[in-house]
């Protein structure tokens, strides 16, 4: 009988020692990507490695905005990468309005920055782009084909 209080005290001590205030830390989900953007003269695409909280289309669009590759925030309606490595990206109407207002060089640089950044981030082979579920049409081009990596110098 004398052992029972000692055993109970020992069990209580072990239980209290196992309790801590530390919370489980989630695994680091940050991703390192290469963001492409235009030089000041809209003549060449430049690139820079940046860290984003996690690899997602929304975080990639935010990184493009931060580097000045796009001039305003753009919503991502949908994103899918098929078995062949082609990304199917549907952006909000703000992207269509923004790129349609560009000149030829500005459009090339913005499209190149977008396409190259996504292809590089996801190691994809191509990108099919839509705006609000429709083919993107600007004054310079109709983007009804799979876009591939843009050369850094046009």
Could you tell me what each predicted segment is?
Residues 4-8, 18-154:
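Bimodal "functional hotspot" detector
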């Amino acid at each position: 009988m004398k052992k029972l209080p000692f055993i109970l005290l020992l069990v209580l001590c072990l239980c209290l020692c196992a309790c801590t205030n530390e919370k489980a830390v989630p695994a680091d989900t940050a991703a390192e990507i290469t963001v492409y953007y235009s030089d000041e003269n809209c003549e060449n695409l430049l690139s820079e490695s940046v860290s984003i909280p996690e690899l997602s289309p929304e975080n990639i669009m935010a990184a493009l905005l931060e580097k000045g590759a796009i001039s305003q925030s753009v919503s991502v309606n949908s994103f899918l990468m098929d078995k062949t490595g082609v990304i199917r990206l549907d952006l909000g109407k703000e992207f269509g309005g923004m790129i349609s207002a560009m000149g030829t060089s500005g459009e090339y640089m913005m499209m190149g920055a977008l396409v190259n950044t996504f292809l590089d981030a996801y190691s994809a082979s191509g990108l099919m782009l839509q705006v609000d579920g429709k083919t993107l049409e600007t004054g310079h081009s109709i983007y009804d084909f799979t876009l591939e990596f843009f050369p850094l110098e046009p």
